[in-house]
């Protein structure tokens, strides 16, 4: 009896082992299917992003082209504006020069009018003086006559006549004086009126000033010069009229000669065209006869071809009916296959949705871990900087007291040209020189190295292939669930700085302050982290 019990127990254990193997196999198959669906999903996302990138590039190119066209148009408009402004300035300068010339002419006319007025005044003053001299002489003569022939009868007889003559002379002198005054006043009034009129006309019609001044000069000339000038003007007009008639006659003669040559050429061309048309008509008659014969032959061939085409059409209709029936059968098959594919795609979509929901939980876990590591890096870096600065100041104080030697100069502000800065010590925390080849515990790593491990795991989970450094051979990372307990290979940890920012595609990390490096111990290359 005891032997039977033992055998029964062994059979149960074997069944349990087989069931465990089957479950393990099913888990592996489900993981493979998940990986495939994940890969297909990310390929679809990659295609969508690539398509959107091409569209953005085309849009940017079109915007750049539009910007270039607008720049060229603006340059052209500015150039045209500059040319127009230059042309207007040139016209203004020409108008200013013309105004200046007219003003000079006006000044010259005024000066000439003033000279003529002075000459007239001088002339009339001379005439008045001469008349006064004559009057004085006559008066003296009359006095002499009166004194000498006072007693003479003849003087008495002539006295009345002489008095009359004297009155007439006085009256003539008075009239001459009045006429002179009137003419002088009229000339002055005319001069002022003419001056005002010239000033107004110079403001309104500058171009007509020369003609008016010319006409005034003609009025003030004497009759002989005026007649000569008028005759000169008339001859000039007649000469210009005859020249114009001569030119018109020459033009009409030339036009008639050209028309004659043109008519002769047209006659020659018409004769040639008539000859060509006659020859063409004869050729056309021959061609018409040949074409009529060809038409008859083609009609016969067309009748034969129509009969053959009707036979071919009947055969093709029968063949098309057969192909249509076969196509309907094939279409029904394809519809069934399409329905099956749609059902399969729906199942794949549900599976992908479930996978994404599971991945979001893992992503949030790793993002929280990354944020915590960055916080630890920042606190460790600040703590080391404070400790190093206090140690440096204490050494400087001791050296100033003569108890110890002066230390090397050290900076704490991460300057560009500093040779001994705290950041140089902090950069040692990212190096892997203190780790030997083989396996190492995750607790032996610095916070910076832990951050790189997490980012490398992100890249591996998202399907990215990181660029390894040539110094270490690559090896697969450890399991994510036991990352804080198990050991990982250090060859997977060395990567370039640009890959340290890898993260999930489905999520975005908020911008945090740039993480500082944790201070490594200079002798051992290990991190000294304090809580």
From Swiss-Prot:
Chief site of localization: cytoplasm
Function statement: Basal body protein required in multiciliate cells to align and maintain cilia orientation in response to flow. May act by mediating a maturation step that stabilizes and aligns cilia orientation. Not required to respond to planar cell polarity (PCP) or flow-based orientation cues.
Top-rank lineage group of the source organism: Eukaryota
Induction: Up-regulated by foxj1 during motile cilia formation.
Coiled coil start-end: 26-213, 274-365
Protein name according to UniProt: Basal body-orientation factor 1
Subcellular compartments: Cytoplasm, Cytoskeleton, Cilium basal body
Lineage, highest ranks first: Eukaryota, Metazoa, Chordata, Craniata, Vertebrata
Null allele phenotype: Cilia in multiciliate cells are motile but fail to produce flow. Multiciliated cells are present in the normal number, cilia of normal length and of normal density. They are however misoriented.
Biased composition (Basic residues): 1-19
GO CC terms in record: ciliary basal body; cytoplasm
Keywords: Cell projection, Cilium, Coiled coil, Cytoplasm, Cytoskeleton
Tissues and organs where the protein is expressed, per its UniProt entry: Multiciliated cells.
Pfam families cross-referenced by the UniProt entry: DUF4515
Composition skew (Basic and acidic residues), residue ranges: 20-32, 482-499
């Amino acid at each position: 009896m005891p032997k039977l019990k033992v055998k029964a127990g062994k059979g149960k254990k074997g069944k349990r082992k087989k069931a465990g193997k089957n479950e393990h196999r099913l888990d592996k198959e489900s993981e493979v299917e998940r990986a495939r669906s994940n890969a297909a999903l990310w390929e679809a996302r990659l295609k969508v992003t690539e398509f959107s990138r091409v569209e953005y590039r085309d849009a940017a190119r079109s915007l750049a082209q539009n910007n270039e066209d607008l720049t060229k148009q603006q340059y052209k408009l500015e150039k045209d504006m500059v040319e127009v402004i230059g042309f207007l300035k040139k016209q203004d300068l020409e108008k200013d020069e013309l105004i200046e010339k007219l003003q000079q002419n006006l000044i010259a006319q005024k000066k000439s009018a003033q000279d003529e007025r002075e000459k007239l005044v001088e002339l009339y003053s001379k005439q008045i003086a001469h008349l006064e001299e004559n009057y004085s002489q006559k008066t003296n003569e009359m006095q002499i006559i009166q004194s000498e022939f006072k007693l003479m009868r003849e003087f008495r007889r002539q006295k009345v006549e002489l008095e009359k003559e004297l009155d007439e002379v006085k009256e003539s002198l008075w009239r001459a004086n009045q006429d002179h005054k009137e003419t002088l006043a009229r000339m002055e009034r005319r001069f002022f009126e003419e001056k005002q009129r010239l000033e107004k006309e110079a403001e309104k019609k500058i171009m007509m000033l020369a003609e008016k001044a010319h006409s005034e000069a003609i009025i003030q000339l004497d009759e002989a010069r005026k007649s000569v000038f008028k005759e000169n003007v008339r001859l000039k007009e007649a000469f210009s009229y005859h020249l114009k008639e001569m030119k018109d006659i020459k033009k009409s003669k030339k036009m008639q000669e050209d028309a004659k040559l043109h008519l002769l050429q047209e006659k020659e061309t018409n004769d040639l065209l008539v000859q060509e048309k006659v020859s063409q008509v004869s050729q056309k008659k021959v061609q018409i006869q040949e074409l009529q014969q060809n038409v008859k032959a083609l009609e016969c061939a067309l009748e034969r071809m129509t009969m053959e085409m009707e036979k071919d059409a009947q055969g093709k209709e029968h063949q098309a009916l057969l192909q249509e029936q076969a196509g309907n059968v094939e279409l029904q098959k394809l519809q069934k296959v399409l329905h099956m594919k749609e059902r399969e795609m729906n199942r794949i979509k549900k599976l992908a949705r479930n996978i994404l929901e599971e991945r979001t939980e893992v992503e949030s876990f790793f993002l929280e871990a990354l944020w915590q590591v960055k916080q630890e890096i920042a606190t460790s870096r600040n703590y080391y900087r404070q400790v190093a600065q206090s140690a440096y100041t204490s050494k400087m104080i001791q050296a100033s007291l003569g108890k110890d030697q002066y230390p090397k100069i050290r900076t704490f502000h991460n300057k560009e040209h500093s040779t001994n800065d705290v950041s140089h010590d902090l950069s040692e925390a990212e190096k892997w020189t203190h780790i030997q080849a083989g396996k190492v515990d995750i607790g032996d790593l610095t916070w910076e190295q832990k951050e790189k491990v997490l980012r490398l795991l992100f890249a591996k989970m998202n399907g990215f292939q990181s660029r390894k450094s040539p110094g270490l051979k690559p090896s697969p990372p450890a399991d994510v669930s036991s990352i804080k307990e198990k050991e990982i290979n250090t060859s997977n940890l060395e990567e370039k700085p640009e890959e340290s920012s890898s993260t999930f595609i489905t999520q975005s990390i908020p911008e945090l302050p740039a993480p500082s490096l944790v201070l490594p111990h200079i002798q051992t290359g290990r991190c000294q982290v304090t809580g």
